[in-house]
Curated annotation (Swiss-Prot):
This protein is one of the early assembly proteins of the 50S ribosomal subunit, although it is not seen to bind rRNA by itself. It is important during the early stages of 50S assembly. Belongs to the universal ribosomal protein uL13 family. GO terms for molecular function: mRNA binding; structural constituent of ribosome. Coiled coil: none annotated. It comes from Helicobacter acinonychis (strain Sheeba). Part of the 50S ribosomal subunit. The gene is rplM. This is Large ribosomal subunit protein uL13. Keywords: Ribonucleoprotein, Ribosomal protein. One of its GO terms (cellular component) is cytosolic large ribosomal subunit. It comes from the Bacteria. GO terms for biological process: negative regulation of translation; translation. CDD domains: Ribosomal_L13 (cd00392). SUPFAM superfamilies: Ribosomal protein L13.
């Protein structure tokens, strides 16, 4: 008989991932799997059974090809002529946290459950983070 997970039965872990010298896309897919809980044997799609993920050294990640110069992110406020664009290099220097959230958000469900999952992602530029008390089990994969 298939057992479905209940919210009361889930014990969340804190996973620290070091982004230094890792390929961005592969790291993002690993983060999305951990946030959704698909690595657990009792994964249930309609229950948030994922872990908390802390990413350190966020701006030291690698990109393949010419993505740093070629890839652009667009924003639009709704007013005429207000389209602005930033390259991947600019996003990585100014707001790497936003870059990770945008990439992971695209891999999560576009529902209330997805919003709850993305709140469990913590991204930091360097190797210092305020979650050292929670991260006792798994450190720096």
């Amino acid at each position: 008989m298939t057992k479905t997970a209940k919210v009361s039965d889930i014990v969340r872990d804190w996973v620290v991932l070091d982004a230094k010298d890792k390929v961005f896309g592969r790291l993002i897919t690993e983060i999305a799997v951990l946030l959704r809980g698909k690595h657990r044997p009792f994964y249930t799609p309609n229950v948030d059974c994922g872990d908390f993920v802390v990413v350190i050294n966020a701006n030291k990640v690698k990109f393949s090809g010419m993505k740093l110069e070629d890839k652009e992110y667009f924003t639009h406020s709704g007013y005429f002529g207000s389209t602005k664009s930033k390259t991947l290099q600019e996003m990585l220097e100014k707001t790497p946290e936003k870059l990770y959230h945008l990439a992971v958000r695209g891999m999560l469900p576009k529902t209330k459950l997805g919003k709850a999952m993305i709140k469990k992602l913590k991204v930091y530029r360097d190797d210092k983070h305020p979650h050292t008390a929670q991260t006792s089990k798994k450190d720096a994969k």
